[in-house]
Amino acid sequence: MSHKRFNPLTASSSDEDELETPIREVEDSSSDEETDSDSDSELGKKDEVVTEVSALNNQESKSVKISEKSVAKRSRETHEAQASADVKKAKKVKKRGGGGGEEAETKKAYFQRVWTDDDEIVVLEGFIDYKNDSG
């Protein structure tokens, strides 16, 4: 049975720093008697163990956060580099004919086309009709 109880010796003002220690079950009733010095030394040992464990947990969580950020940053950088390389390749087209392998830049596309040429013509004709009707 693992009950946890609040340890007032390790308490702090913030909720994040509160630590719980498991309650020790007593199996033999004949060993119920303890001297004050025995219980004090046990509390000191528990405090040391609890502080060591909490310090290790803090260090582990910091290292995990750092590694997640660096991995995400690296993947984003490589993705951006690949995208820019693809754009550069798309902008350059090899000349066909007697160019001898020279590359010429094509017209730069500033945005991705959503409509076809036919759709664009229909919309422009609609603008013209509206302008003629409304004046």
Curated annotation (Swiss-Prot):
Keyword Transcription among record annotations: yes
Keywords: Transcription, Transcription regulation
Compositionally biased spans, kind Basic and acidic residues: 62-80
Renumbered residue ranges of the record's region Disordered: 1-104
Biased composition annotated in UniProt, kind: Acidic residues: 28-41
Membership in a protein family: Belongs to the GeBP family.
Protein name: Probable transcription factor At2g20613
Species in which this protein is naturally found: Arabidopsis thaliana
